[in-house]
Structures are given as C-alpha cells and as structure tokens.
Swiss-Prot record:
Keywords: Cell cycle, Cell division, DNA-binding. This is Probable cell division protein WhiA. Belongs to the WhiA family. Involved in cell division and chromosome segregation. The gene is whiA. GO terms for molecular function: DNA binding. It holds the Pfam family LAGLIDADG_WhiA. The keyword DNA-binding applies.
Amino acid sequence: MPLTSDVKEELSRVEVSKTTVRAAELATILRFSGGLHLISNRIAVESELDTPLLARRVRKDLAELYGVRSDISVIPASGMRRATHYLVRVMEGGETLARQTGLLDARRRPIRGLPNRLTTGSREEIAAVWRGAFLAAGTLTDPGRSAALEVTCPGNEAAMALVGAAGRLDVSAKAREVRGVHRVVIRDGDAIGQMLRVMGAQGTVVNWEEMRQRREVRATANRLVNFDDANLRRSAQAAVAACARVERAMEILGPDIPEHLKYAGDLRLRFRDSSLDELGHHADPPMTKDAVAGRIRRLLAMADKKAVDEGLPGTDANLPADLDDV
C-alpha cells in the first residue's frame, strides 16, 4: 500500500521535543506492535516493525528515554509474511521498561487496553498515541468508496481506548471485530484528513486530499453522464410512444380528423426525434410547445373516445412491446 508507506515514512520523521509526548508514542508502539515475552525466566519487551526507519526511531527513544539497550534482528519475508520486518527486543531491564511504559500494572500483570496515563494525557500526547498506533499497525487506503484509515489492535480493550482517544481529538472512529481481529476504523474522508494532520502527516494529507478531489470530480462526471443517458433514454421512449399513438389515432379517426389536429399529428410523425419545442419551430406559422402538446393531446383523446364508442383498440394498441428497452 503506497499510501500507508508514505504516511509511515513521514510519521517516522516527525520531530518531537517533549519527553512525555515521545514516551506516549513509544509506549503505544510497543503495545500495538509486539508484547511481553518470558525468555529464560526474564520478561522481554518485543516490537515487530515494518520499516528500518521506524526501528531506528524506536531504538533511539528506548535509549534516550529509558536508558535501555535493545537488539534488532531482521525477519525476512516468507509465507504469510509478505515483507521484511524488523524485531526490536529488550532483554536486559525488560521488566523495568514494561513497568515504566505502562505495559505492566503494579501487580506485574500485562495491561489489557492502554495505560491510563496515555488516554488521559494532553491533546499532544493523545495525538502521539494515535501516531504510535498507526506506525505500529495502521493502514491507509486510497480515497474512494472504500477509503479507510485503519489500525489493527491487540484486543478489544485497546481498540476501545483508541476510539476514545480519537474522540479526544474530535475525530469519529469505530471499533469492529472481524474473525477475531479487532480494528479501529475511520471512514469519513474529512475525518481521515483531520487524523492525518493531527498525527503529523502534513505532506501525505495534501496528496490524499488531491486524490480524493480527483475521485470526486470523476464520480460527479460519471453521475452526470448516467443522468444524461437516462434523460435521453426517457426522451426516446416518449417520442416512440407518442408517434405510435398518433399513428393509431390517424387510423381510428380517418377522414374525420379536424385539420388543426391532423396538422399537429403530421408534425409529430414527420419529425419523430424532435422535442415538442422543436416541433413548434417546424410549424408554419411557428407554435409554442404547449400549443403543439395540447393539439396532440386532443387528437389522442378524440381517437380514444371513438375507439371506446365503437369497441376498437385504443391508441395504446400500437405501442411496441419492448418500449422500455428503447
């Protein structure tokens, strides 16, 4: 997904000066991209990331914020894993780090959602939470009918916490579960743009909005074409029906047709594809479209009355069976 890669690269380069904001982003990345593991009776913190740039950012923050040393290993693409991933692991001091980042509670139990201090922090810290979640497990699809900014979550509690964090940023997000996988999704185009800006993807949001506008212009053009096609089809059907009924009216009335009504009927049959307005211009002297329509209407009414009186098929008898397909 090119858009996802663009967003993640830009977010991985966002410069943050406040320690609390950096810590909020890092803790969320660790929560959404890995977890706690027991290795040789020691708690290890692991984070599986999809770009080397993000892996360097995480290792830098681990060292500068918590003074811990981390190892990195490359997981090559294979089988279900479509791309190379980078595993950042903290073994020495892993439990202390887990406590400091809020991944472990006071009773040494792994948290189920997000650390409380993250979801109740400042707006800048909440934005960092979303930035971290997207860097760890987010995707952005192209603008269109199925456009979405989506984050895969480690569980329902984490998903609900992320929805609440979005609300703090005035962005509407929804949690959903599909085949046991919990996700938080933003589908509204304006909301997606707002979240991208809040997270710090200023460059990508410009490209995304341009793509969105182009899609909307194309969609509007297609709707107009379809609208015009439908109008043309209806006009063609109306012309065919009118000509068929006028022909039948001429048959029913024969020589009894008043001259002014016969003239209007002849106009209709001579210029079959013309509109009523155009028929009026063809008349000599010219007539208004209402005058033409009125004469044709009276011609048909007179013919239908005679058909009823004499037990004959009316003017509808000549209508083509496949009229709707015209």
